[in-house]
Amino acid sequence: MKISSQFIFTILVILAFAACKSERTQPVAPQQNAAPAEKDSMLYGLVCEGTNDNALVFYEFKENAQPRTFNIEVAYREGRVVGRMRTGDWVGVMVNPEDSTEATMAIDLDQIKGTWTHTVYPVWKDASKMSKRALRRKLAELPDSLKALYMIPKEYGFSLKRSSQAVPVGIDINQASTEDSPVEYPAMRCVIRWKCRNGKLLLTTVDHDQLGKAMQMVEKNMDTKKAGARTDTLDVMMMTEDSLVLRTVAGETMSFHRTQK
């Protein structure tokens, strides 16, 4: 009897979980972006039982794989083990090219999924034409009732999901309703896709007015560059259960807090 490739794949998944003794389900690997990309040297797989601050027991997502143990003592000490490395979690590993038993970086990709936001505050629409003193005076003259109505902080950010899916957080769907407001919020680019490559986080974003078009293109697996999409490469400087710090190629740091797992 001919055995289908789907059946073989299913058996491999079952064996992976048996090796790791994990009850968690296997995550779906990210989809490839439509644009040409540099080679990804990161290995992807599961954290296995026996992992600690000095060693990562790892089961790679590939045929005939066996659990491997990587030395992560130096990486952990230098802050390049990102996340808690929980048994059964989906992780990415960068291997030392000069020592195949050492991981130079590991990132818990299950833990990075979720909703991450930062707080933004409104500013006067004509703030660029006013001095700081004039702004303070104008705010002081504003009745408390109007302050409560307009000076409301918002949470901007993104939700990272399975299969490279992402959605922006903090978008004002009814944009027209804010046109008569004396204040405005900082412009934000909307995250529509994410992935990890070579130990870095890649976020694909579009302008607010292109969001609907871009999301339709994502659903159809089309190249979102036609919607003005760009992909930013970010270093993950720190990640805890509730905090995420990213750094841009220009050296700017961005801090987020988790609002939903």
Annotate each PLM feature.
Residues 38-77, 122-126, 145-242, 247-252:
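Contiguous, well-ordered beta-strand patches that form the walls/edges
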Residues 77-92:
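Short nucleic-acid-contacting surface segments enriched for D/E, G, S/T with interspersed K/R
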Residues 82-85, 102-117:
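N-terminal helix-cap/turn-to-beta initiation motif at the start of protein domains
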Residues 1-8:
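Bacterial N-terminal signal peptides that target proteins for export
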Residues 110-150, 192:
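Tryptophan-anchored aromatic micro-motifs
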Residues 50-51, 94-101:
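Short, charged beta-turn/beta-strand-edge "cap" motif at the junction between a beta-strand
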Residues 23-44:
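Short boundary/loop segments of OB/S1/cold-shock single-stranded nucleic-acid-binding domains
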